[in-house]
A protein has these predicted regions:
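Basic, helix-initiating cap at the start of DNA-binding domains
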Residues: 1-27, 34-40, 57
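Short hydrophobic/aromatic patch on the recognition helix
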Residues: 41-52
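Hydrophobic alpha-helical connector segments
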Residues: 61, 71-98, 148-152, 175
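Hydrophobic/aromatic-rich alpha-helical bundle segments in the mid-to-C-terminal region
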Residues: 115, 119, 135-189
């Protein structure tokens, strides 16, 4: 059972993360400063440092929360249900998270610590997706499952990136093609 102090600390961390998300969306990770985050959170910089040792610690917590949310969103769903439609229509679970992950990827090209955080988060997401798919498709080998996860990750992440540009092909034409790809990936071997 958590104490009132722990609850207050968690609430304060949530407020800081919310403020940081707004700052990072507006200015990018690289340009957003701790003073901007403090101002947005209506705290002093010193108060922020009580909860997070530096900006990278805030980024790390943000990545952890986004990945936790994505893993939770994966539960109780099969890969083939809804995914062709989501890909074809470029639907997303959380547009803000997608934009922040794109921003984090850009920051990772400049900051080895952020690159390491993203690598660890991706490994966690990949392992969880493999375990989730293995439950749905126990007839597939572990190697094939890993290939399926990699291919679906490329399709999902590519769709997230491509959401920034207009569709060149109607979604109605793309959806059955995505369905065929997924059917082929998860067919009995």
């Amino acid at each position: 059972m958590s104490t009132k102090l722990e609850e207050r600390q968690k609430l304060r961390q949530d407020e800081i993360i919310t403020a940081a998300r707004r700052c990072f969306r507006a200015s990018g990770f690289h340009a957003a400063s701790m003073s901007q985050i403090a101002s947005e959170a209506k705290l002093s910089v010193g108060q922020i440092y009580r909860y997070f040792s530096n900006k990278d610690a805030i980024i790390e917590e943000m990545i952890r929360r986004i990945i936790d949310s994505r893993i939770e969103g994966m539960q109780d769903k099969t890969v083939v249900e809804g995914m062709p439609q989501a890909l074809a229509w470029r639907k997303t679970l959380n547009e803000d998270d997608d934009a922040l992950m794109l921003e984090m990827s850009a920051e990772a090209t400049r900051n080895p610590q952020v690159a390491a955080m993203l690598t660890a988060a991706e490994a966690r997401m990949f392992a969880n997706a493999c375990a989730h798919l293995k439950k749905q498709f126990p007839h597939l080998s572990d190697e094939h499952i890993r290939c399926c996860v990699e291919i679906t990750a490329v399709m999902i992440e590519g769709s997230i990136y491509r959401r920034l540009t207009p569709l060149k092909v109607p979604s109605e034409q793309l959806e059955p093609i995505y369905q065929d790809i997924l059917n082929m990936l998860f067919a009995e071997k």
